[in-house]
């Protein structure tokens, strides 16, 4: 059997992985085995947190809207506000409503008073 000379392929692969892990601390940026383990772990975390970010932002928007709505009227909640929005066919998503709640509260109060009728 003839000998297969791989040249610099393995070194190129390792340097590519090292570049990925260059900002890691300690052995996680120096030793090849730990670099590969940490790389897998980092990519798993990134994949998981991309989905998680969507949930977290939705929760934040709902919290902001609810805080402003409850400040307007004590007996009025986020749940009723969204329900009335759908009944009146005002299609504003939660992100936009949260931005309105932060930047222009009087506008959100106007919207809530209009749909409450």
UniProtKB/Swiss-Prot annotation:
Could you confirm whether the keyword Phosphoprotein appears in this record? no
A molecular function GO annotation = rRNA binding
Q: What is this protein called?
A: Large ribosomal subunit protein bL20c
Query: Record's superkingdom?
Result: Eukaryota
Per the UniProt entry, what are the Gene Ontology biological process annotations, in alphabetical order? ribosomal large subunit assembly; translation
Q: Which InterPro entries match?
A: Ribosomal_bL20 (IPR005813), RIBOSOMAL_L20_CS (IPR049946), Ribosomal_protein_bL20_C (IPR035566)
Family from the record: Belongs to the bacterial ribosomal protein bL20 family.
The task this protein performs is described as:
Binds directly to 23S ribosomal RNA and is necessary for the in vitro assembly process of the 50S ribosomal subunit. It is not involved in the protein synthesizing functions of that subunit.
Q: Which HAMAP family match?
A: Ribosomal_bL20
Spans through the membrane: none
Q: Which organism is it from?
A: Carica papaya (Papaya)
Query: Which Pfam families does the entry link to?
Result: Ribosomal_L20
* Cellular component GO terms held in the UniProt record: chloroplast; ribonucleoprotein complex; ribosome
| Chief subcellular location | plastid
Q: What are the alphabetically sorted keywords of the record? A: Chloroplast, Plastid, Ribonucleoprotein, Ribosomal protein, RNA-binding, rRNA-binding
Subcellular location(s): the record lists:
Plastid, Chloroplast
Q: Which PANTHER family match?
A: 39S RIBOSOMAL PROTEIN L20
């Amino acid at each position: 059997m003839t000998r297969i000379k791989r040249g610099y392929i393995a070194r190129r692969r390792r340097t590519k992985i090292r570049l990925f892990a260059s900002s890691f601390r300690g052995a996680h940026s120096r030793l090849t085995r730990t670099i590969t383990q940490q790389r897998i772990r980092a990519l798993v975390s990134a994949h998981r947190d991309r989905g998680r970010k969507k949930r977290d932002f939705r929760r934040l928007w709902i919290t902001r809207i609810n805080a402003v709505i409850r400040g307007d009227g004590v007996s009025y909640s986020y749940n009723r506000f969204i329900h009335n929005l759908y009944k009146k066919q005002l299609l504003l998503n939660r992100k936009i409503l949260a931005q309105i709640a932060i930047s222009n509260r009087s506008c959100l109060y106007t919207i809530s008073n209009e749909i409450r009728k």
